[in-house]
């Protein structure tokens, strides 16, 4: 393929290296891999009564489990360097990293979730990250 893209899916993998290696195997030389996921800060900052508090460590690259609609959900905390270094090991070169939040999200007067994706957070740091990498 010339392009492989993933919209908010890569973060669900339990084995990032294997996932990136497989994606690399599907791409032609110089093909692009573009993906988005929650910004790495998202897992360590909580909002309480309009205040942002560090509730975890950015450095903890470990899986964590929480309840969603009464069911356990496990995700893996990954730092930006985890994505970059794993992409590099899979034969990719980083072409672009986007750390932005759209102005509509930042300017909402009413919070649109229970605090995970919130305008309060969006005004202080990006909620998501987009990485574009090229297969070498």
What are the language-model segments listed below?
Residues 5, 35-37, 96:
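Hydrophobic residues in well-ordered beta-strands that form the structural core
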Residues 90-92, 113-136:
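Core SAM-dependent methyltransferase catalytic element
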Residues 73-97:
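Short alpha-helix
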Residues 43, 104-106:
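Generic structural signal for helix capping and beta-alpha/helix-loop junctions
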Residues 107-113:
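Acidic, His/Gly-rich catalytic cores of divalent-metal-dependent hydrolytic chemistry
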Residues 33-64:
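Conserved class I S-adenosyl-L-methionine
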Residues 2-17:
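A short SAM/SAH-binding and catalytic strip from SAM-dependent methyltransferases
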